[in-house]
Curated annotation (Swiss-Prot):
GO biological processes: endoplasmic reticulum tubular network organization; nuclear envelope organization; nuclear pore complex assembly
Subunit organization: Interacts with RTN4.
Lineage of the organism: Eukaryota, Metazoa, Chordata, Craniata, Vertebrata
Native organism: Mus musculus
Protein name in the entry: Transmembrane protein 170A
UniProt superkingdom: Eukaryota
Length: 144
């Protein structure tokens, strides 16, 4: 994989690294003591990385579901508003609960003194969305 300033043709490995790395904070001259230039070391970097993946994966799941609901319920008197609620929950849910859970994850990593690689942020962020989707489809809350 190529370094940022090398200027060569990166190929697919360079593109994958660029997608997963998020490039949140420039490492030049900001005083961050991180042994690896691609890892996330500070709390805001870790929090933002996990939160961004949670938000985007939630939008990825909820937008098609909302559009499908809008299409199938377009002639229903009140049913068409359900699609709006699906779309809103795809954004409002991760913004409210995702902020807290991402901060908790980043806090645990920071307290342990562990750095987070971008793939861990991807896994933890999409894992939050996966848990929400599983609870929604299994209807666990309706059995309580």
């Amino acid at each position: 994989m190529e370094r940022e300033g090398s200027g060569g043709g990166g190929g697919s490995a360079g593109l994958l690294q660029q997608i997963l790395s998020l490039k949140l904070v420039p490492r030049v001259g900001n005083g961050t003591l991180c042994p690896n230039s691609t890892s996330l070391c500070s709390f805001p970097e870790m929090w933002y990385g996990v939160f961004l993946w949670a938000l985007m994966s939630s939008v990825f799941f909820h937008v098609p579901a909302g559009l499908l609901a809008l299409f199938t319920l377009r002639h229903h008197k009140y049913g068409r508003f359900m699609s709006v609620s699906i779309l809103l929950m795809g954004i409002v849910g991760p913004i409210t609960a995702g902020i807290l859970t991402s901060a908790a994850i980043a806090g645990v990593y920071r307290a342990a003194g562990k750095e987070m690689i971008p793939f861990e942020a991807l896994t933890l962020g999409t894992g939050q969305t996966f848990c929400v989707v599983v609870v929604s489809f299994l209807r666990v809350l309706a059995t309580l």
